[in-house]
Amino acid sequence: MTNIRKTHPLAKIINNTFIDLPTPSNISAWWNFGSLLATCLILQILTGLFLAMHYTSDTTTAFSSITHICRDVNYGWIIRYMHANGASMFFICLYAHMGRGIYYGSYTLAETWNIGIVLLLTIMATAFMGYVLPWGQMSFWGATVITNLLSAIPYVGTDLVEWVWGGFSVDKATLTRFLALHFVLPFMALALTAVHLLFLHETGSNNPSGILSDSDKIPFHPYYTIKDILGLIILILILMLLVLFSPDLLGDPDNYTPANPLSTPPHIKPEWYFLFAYAILRSIPNKLGGVLALLLSILVLAIVPSLHTSKQRSMMFRPISQCLFWLLVADLITLTWIGGQPVEHPFIIIGQLASILYFMILLVFMPIAGMIENSILKW
C-alpha cells in the first residue's frame, strides 16, 4: 500500500514541499533564512493576535493599553517584547535572505524574485503601521512625517494625505485604520509566501556554485529539516536573549512618552531597519526627489536580474563582484548609521555620498564587473 503522505490530496502538498522535495546537496546555511522568515511571520501573527485582544485603537487610551498589557496582562510583557523584537529578527533574516539572493544570483529565478520584492514591500508597510500603534512620541511623529511624503505627489498629493489620515492630521481615524491594515497585511504576506514557494518549487532551488544541480539532489527530509531546526534554535535563542535581557535595545526611548502633537522630538527617526531608506530619503534636498529615491531604493531590486551581465550565475568564483557586494553591505550599514544621526555636517554629505554609491553599485558597477570578469575568462 502506498504511503498516505503520497496519496492524500493535502498530505501530498506537504510531502512535495517539505519531505520528498529534491534539494541541491550543497546548499549552505545561507539557505536557512527562508524557513526562519516563515517562523518569524507565524510568531508575529500569533503574538500580534494576543496583543490585539488587549489593545485599544483610540488616541486617548492606546498608550495606556500598552502599559496595561505590560503590567496587568499575564505574560503580556513577554508577548509585547517578543512582537517588537520579533520584527527586528524578521528584518535581519529578510536582509540576509535578500543578500544571499544577490550574492548567489538567485534573482535569475525572476518570478520568485519579483514576488519576494512584493513581499518585502508588504512587510515594510506592516512594520511601519505597527510602529504607529503604541502611540508614543516617535509613533505619532513618524506617522506624520512618512504619511506627509504623499503630499509630494503633484496635483493629488494634499487630498491623498488627508484621505490617508481620515482628517486634517494624524488622529483617531488614522490610528484605527492603521490597526486594521496592520492586522490584515500579515495574512496577505502569508498568502504571498505560499505563491513565493510555489514559484520556487517550479524551478527548484539555486545553490552556492550557481550551476544546475539536477544530477545531485537529495530529499529535503531529514537532511534539511534538521539543518532548519538548528537555525531555528539559534534564532529563538537570539530573540529570547534580546527579549529577556535588553528588550528596549533596538527601540527608541521617545516612544515611552505619550504622543503629543504640540511637542516635536529633537530627532524624528523610524525603527533601525528602515534607517537606510530614511537616509536615502533625507539625502535629497527636494521633497519629491527624496520620495522617488526612497521608492527606487527598494524597486531597484526589480531590475537587478536585467542587469546581470556575467556568464556565471553565482559570485562564488567572481572576486571583483564579491568586492562590490561587500562594499554594498558596508554602504548599507553606513546608510543605517547616517539615518539615525541628526541632519547636520558631516552627516549630510556622508549620507549623500553613500546614497549615490548604493545606486551606482547596483546599476553601474556590478554590470561592468560582470563584463570585466567575462573578458578575464575569455568568454
Swiss-Prot record:
Q: Which residues form a coiled coil?
A: none
* Residues the entry annotates as binding heme b b566: 97, 196
Membrane-related topology note: Multi-pass membrane protein
Q: What is its cofactor?
A: heme b
UniProt-annotated location(s): Mitochondrion inner membrane
Query: Which GO terms of the molecular function aspect are on file?
Result: metal ion binding; ubiquinol-cytochrome-c reductase activity
Q: Which Gene3D superfamilies match?
A: Cytochrome Bc1 Complex, Chain C
- Classification via InterPro entries: Cyt_b/b6_C (IPR005798), Cyt_b/b6_C_sf (IPR036150), Cyt_b/b6_N (IPR005797), Cytb/b6-like_sf (IPR027387), Cytochrome_b (IPR030689), Cytochrome_b_C_euk/bac (IPR048260), Cytochrome_b_N_euk/bac (IPR048259), Di-haem_cyt_TM (IPR016174)
Which positions bind a ubiquinone? 201
Q: Which domain of life is it from?
A: Eukaryota
What residue ranges are annotated as transmembrane? 33-53, 77-98, 113-133, 178-198, 226-246, 288-308, 320-340, 347-367
Other facts: Heme 1 (or BL or b562) is low-potential and absorbs at about 562 nm, and heme 2 (or BH or b566) is high-potential and absorbs at about 566 nm.
Description of how the protein assembles with itself and partners: The cytochrome bc1 complex contains 11 subunits: 3 respiratory subunits (MT-CYB, CYC1 and UQCRFS1), 2 core proteins (UQCRC1 and UQCRC2) and 6 low-molecular weight proteins (UQCRH/QCR6, UQCRB/QCR7, UQCRQ/QCR8, UQCR10/QCR9, UQCR11/QCR10 and a cleavage product of UQCRFS1). This cytochrome bc1 complex then forms a dimer.
What is the protein named? Cytochrome b
Query: Which species is the source of this protein?
Result: Odobenus rosmarus rosmarus
